Regions:
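Glycine-enriched, solvent-exposed interface loops adjoining structured elements
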Residues: 1-256
Length: 256
């Protein structure tokens, strides 16, 4: 079971020799108890904001609903170019925290009425500047005529970062798969659990100790805690972000 907001707060309160909180009085904390809760949240957000592509922030599991590439998808509409990345989001604060623009895939697998042979294609990311200079004029002239569309080969990002566009304009329904990562949220209730494995709880605690020592004007201990935090964070990144060897790739064949 993942470590909770209450457990993290009490671990720090014990170190300070202060009265611990309970699930019953967690919302009625005062003084140093409230300060510790604030520090836990600040440290937690420091950690999860360190890397927008932490595996535990993924919006879904790859292949959970379909063996295709990606962890979420949008279905296109014939004759429509632009689509919200997160359809249920009402503003940017509810959008995805990160989208991997190098991993968009188009397919007809799973589309109602489609059968083999299916269309499957990688979508090349094209900057909005390149698209508007070389493609927008001609394609927008035909925007109202879906017959002039086709199977998209490029994906573009809207200037406000909230939508993706397809070029050429889709001529039918396709599924567009991609990898998305959620924005982290603050801990609030006593039972709220951290999103990362308990193995890395000491990293969060060291970050919280840094803030506590700063609060008490203990610069030396704050520096020690910061070094412990940085060391733990490097290990965390090594285990969760860099488990595979580095390599160079050539996209000339991939998108041909």
């Amino acid at each position: 079971m993942a470590t909770t907001y209450l457990q993290l707060s009490n671990e720090l309160l014990r170190e300070l020799n202060e009265v611990e909180l309970t699930s019953a009085n967690f919302g009625d904390s005062v003084g140093i108890q409230t300060h510790v809760k604030d520090i836990v949240n600040r440290s937690y957000l420091d950690m999860v904001n360190e890397e927008p592509q932490w595996p535990f922030l993924a919006t879904g599991e790859s292949g959970a609903t379909d063996p295709m590439y990606g962890n979420t998808y949008i279905e296109t509409v014939a004759g429509t170019r632009w689509y919200e990345l997160k359809t249920a989001a009402s503003s940017i604060k509810d959008d995805y925290g990160y989208v991997d623009w190098d991993n968009f895939l188009l397919t007809t697998v799973g589309v109602s009425g489609e059968s083999a042979p299916y269309t499957v294609r990688n979508l090349r990311y094209t900057s909005i500047e390149t698209w508007k200079d070389y493609f927008r004029g001609g394609q927008n002239k035909d925007d109202a005529d879906q017959a002039t569309g086709g199977t998209p080969s490029r994906v573009i990002k809207s200037p406000d970062n909230r939508k993706f566009g397809l070029s050429p304009i889709p001529d039918q329904v396709y599924r567009i798969w991609f990898y998305a990562y959620d924005l982290p949220t603050e801990l609030s209730a006593h039972g709220d659990a951290i999103v990362f494995p308990d193995l890395y709880v000491p990293v969060l605690i060291n970050r919280a100790r840094y803030y506590l020592h700063q609060f008490k004007d203990n610069a030396q201990n704050a520096a020690f805690a910061m070094e412990d935090y940085k060391r733990g964070l490097r290990t965390m990144k090594l285990h969760l972000m860099d488990p595979t060897p580095n390599y160079f790739k050539d996209d000339r064949i991939r998108f041909s």
